[in-house]
């Protein structure tokens, strides 16, 4: 790595996904606002909290929710059926 090309706050940061209870140590300049956490190696690292990651996102975990599109289409048709029938009567 070339010297003097990274900002002063380039350090090891713990990125932690609380919903999956998983974390990763990555060198980063991410702002952690003074939050820290003790990791499994016993050392304390700056903490960057994640709402979702590959460990918890349904696309990556395979736990996707199937949406019943037929139900959505029938609701749409019911809602606008009266509008469409009055439109057809006017012509």
Swiss-Prot record:
Question: One Pfam family, short name please?
Answer: Ribosomal_L31
Recorded superkingdom:
Bacteria
**Single GO molecular function:** structural constituent of ribosome
Q: Where are the transmembrane segments?
A: none
The UniProt record lists the keyword Endoplasmic reticulum: no
What Gene Ontology terms for biological process does this UniProt record contain?
Answer: translation
One CC-aspect GO term = ribonucleoprotein complex
Which PROSITE patterns does this UniProt record tie to the protein? RIBOSOMAL_L31
Of which family is this protein a member?
A: Belongs to the bacterial ribosomal protein bL31 family. Type B subfamily.
Q: What is this protein called?
A: Large ribosomal subunit protein bL31B
The set of disulfide-linked cysteines is: none
Could you list this entry's UniProt keywords, alphabetically sorted. Answer: Ribonucleoprotein, Ribosomal protein
Assembly and partners are described as:
Part of the 50S ribosomal subunit.
């Amino acid at each position: 790595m070339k010297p003097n090309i990274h900002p002063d706050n380039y350090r090891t940061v713990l990125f932690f996904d609380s919903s999956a209870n998983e974390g990763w140590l990555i060198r980063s300049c991410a702002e952690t606002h003074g939050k820290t956490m003790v990791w499994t190696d016993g050392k304390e690292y700056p903490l960057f909290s994640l709402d979702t990651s590959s460990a918890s996102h349904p696309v990556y975990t395979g736990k996707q929710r199937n949406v019943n599109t037929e139900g959505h289409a029938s609701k749409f048709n019911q809602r606008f059926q009266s509008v469409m029938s009055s439109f057809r009567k006017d012509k």
